[in-house]
């Protein structure tokens, strides 16, 4: 109903023959409002992703405390950011985005646990999962939101 109202309210008046085409097109694009939310959340996501080199240094130095601080501090809101993005993606993309977000959150939790246990080999393995998780999830963000 919301899409019909926004289509009907937009000038010029739409004839009944063009309305089904407009509805079909609306289902395949992200609304400007949703794209604005995605853009804001994607910016936060990319800021966390940009801290991967810092996290890698902490992992390589076996800096248990600051590894955990980075995960629990600046990277902590990632779950919420990905949730907000996923809710506004096209319906056909949401399941895969949810899967990739869950994998990244799990990898971060496992990295945090490896640092807590001071397990160096596990820390290195989990960092690799975190880095690939960031890359995999970033592919779900529409290019328009990153420009």
Locations of regions flagged by a protein language model:
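N-terminal plastid-targeting presequences
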Residues: 1-147
